[in-house]
UniProtKB/Swiss-Prot annotation:
InterPro entries: AA/rel_permease1 (IPR002293), Amino_acid_antiprt (IPR004754), APC_superfamily (IPR050367)
Source organism phylogeny: Bacteria, Pseudomonadati, Chlamydiota, Chlamydiia, Chlamydiales
Organism: Chlamydia abortus (strain DSM 27085 / S26/3) (Chlamydophila abortus)
Positions of transmembrane segments: 12-32, 41-61, 85-105, 132-152, 160-180, 211-231, 242-262, 296-316, 341-361, 367-387, 418-438, 461-481
Single GO molecular function: antiporter activity
Protein name: Arginine/agmatine antiporter
Major subcellular site: membrane
Length: 486
């Protein structure tokens, strides 16, 4: 029997939700940002890349903010926006892809956590895929599972502490690099077009921008954190505030971390530092204590992000099951109103994926790249739904956001989402379609048993399922004949 709980469960305010957004966006990768950005670009190109990415992601962030205000009834937005705008099967497919993406993403956090521990306990956890690392990661999967089972509010409080814990080392890094900043060093080869014995030619501005934007476009995955948890928010306005606050805060930190080191070290020096490069930079600038601080920060960051995504990832199948597009069993809650079955199934799948890490690192890395692409259609569907709803007579034009503003925001958000999908790569997109097609049997099962059985399998749904199945078969053919290679 599905429990409705005795309380509403709406207990997450703007601060808790903003912590969710920041924690889900700022993971372990940020501690490698100085080297990642400097690897193939000068500081001028890096600044432009962040401006372009920031503008594009602003429209996606604002899409989520507007939708949370004009359609507060659509909680768990990523899934519900797609379902409301384009029907049950599209909603299911977006939710299914997002769920798979975050399952593998969480296992990625397990690998990064163990690899970060290797700094303190070498060589037992090297690479995050040794036997001790797999055992340690497996234990943490279930620790986080039981933390979230105790209640979303308690887990979000722990997450706020973790978010503060990982921001402190980053702020220290920013303060130190700002204090030691020298304009003369910063201006040296600003556009990356000077060749010296130590400084190779970095290429055209276009090539520099492309290489850096492949880094920046992934930096904002997680911006939807507050929207996904909106069913547990105190108010719709808290969701919008948290999304914009999280976006602005993260963008500021990203820019400062990427640019300030160029005032102390030259591009070729930054490009040659081993990751996590924030640790290497501080080791050069202030000594060993700086390196240790950054590695501690990395460990806290990964654990905090992992907890955030554990809360988020279980919410999608739980919400979809309540609407009849996932098997009904996923809607079962415990006494703390946590999505019990959804959490256990998600954690079990993560556990299986941990074994894949141990037996085949190459296969794991490929799977991580594929599932990373699967989150992007959710952004496009949300932006497209905003455009569609802005044309609807039910749009609240007397509210704070006019229909024209909503339409432009959605259009620009959709355009940027298409760019993200393109930048992700065709081969990974095709593999993602195969994984999306694997969800079809679950959708059919939900349609036969769910509360909305009468509305399932209309001509529109049959057509959509047929298209996805055809594209999946085409992708299998292209890979099997090596027309396209991973």
């Amino acid at each position: 029997m599905i429990s409705n709980g005795s309380k509403s469960g709406k207990n997450l305010g703007a601060i808790a939700l903003a912590g969710m957004v920041i924690s889900s966006m700022i993971g372990g990768g940020i501690f490698s940002l100085p080297q990642n950005m400097a690897a193939s670009a000068g500081v001028g190109a890096i600044i432009l890349a962040w401006i372009l990415t920031g503008v594009g992601m602003f429209f996606i962030a604002n899409t989520f903010k507007i939708l949370s205000l004009v359609r507060p009834d659509l909680t768990t937005g990523i899934y519900m926006y797609s379902r409301e705008g384009f029907g049950p099967y599209i909603g299911f497919t977006i939710g299914w892809g997002y769920w798979l993406c975050q399952i593998f993403g969480n296992v990625g956090y397990a690998v990064m956590t163990m690899d970060a521990l290797n700094y303190f306990f070498p060589p037992y956890f090297q690479g995050g895929n040794t036997l001790p690392a797999i055992l340690g990661g497996s234990i943490l999967i279930w620790v986080f599972n039981f933390i979230v089972l105790k209640g979303i509010r308690q887990a979000s409080f722990i997450n706020i502490i973790g978010t503060v814990g990982k921001l402190v080392p980053l702020i220290v890094f920013i303060i130190i690099t700002a204090f030691l900043f020298k304009l003369a060093i910063f201006k040296t080869d600003f556009w990356g077009d000077t060749v010296t014995k130590t400084q190779p030619l970095l290429g055209s501005m276009t090539s520099q921008l492309k290489s850096t934007m492949l880094v920046t476009l992934w930096a904002f995955i997680g911006i939807e954190g507050a929207v996904v948890m909106s069913a547990r928010a105190k108010s719709p306005s808290a969701v919008g505030k948290a999304t914009i606050l999280g976006f602005t805060g993260c963008l500021t930190v990203y820019i400062l971390l990427s640019i300030l080191p160029f005032g102390s070290l030259f591009q070729h020096q930054l490009a040659g530092i081993a990751n996590p490069s924030t640790a290497g930079v501080l080791d050069i600038l202030v000594g060993k204590w700086g390196e240790i601080l950054m590695n501690v920060g990395l460990l806290i960051a990964v654990l905090s992000s992992w907890l955030s995504w554990t809360m988020i990832v279980a919410e999608i199948p739980y919400s979809a099951a309540k609407n009849g597009t996932f098997p009904e069993i996923f809607a079962i809650e415990n006494a703390h109103r946590s999505p019990k079955v959804s959490l256990y199934v998600t954690s079990a799948l993560m556990q299986i994926a941990m074994l894949l890490v141990y037996f085949s690192t190459d296969a794991w890395n490929t799977m991580l790249s594929i599932t990373g692409v699967m989150v992007l259609p959710a952004y496009f569907a949300s932006a497209a739904f905003l455009v569609k709803f802005s044309k609807n007579k039910k749009y609240p034009n007397k509210g704070p956001i006019k229909a024209f503003t909503a339409k432009i925001t959605g259009l620009l958000g959709a355009v940027y989402s298409i760019w993200l999908i393109y930048a992700g790569g065709l081969k990974y997109l095709l593999m993602a379609i195969i994984l999306l097609a694997l969800g079809i049997p679950f959708y059919i099962d939900a349609g036969k048993k769910g509360r909305n059985a009468k509305t399932f399998f209309a001509k529109k749904e049959v057509t959509e399922i047929t298209i996805i199945a055809f594209l999946a078969l085409l992708a299998i053919f292209l890979f099997s004949t090596e027309k396209i290679r991973l």
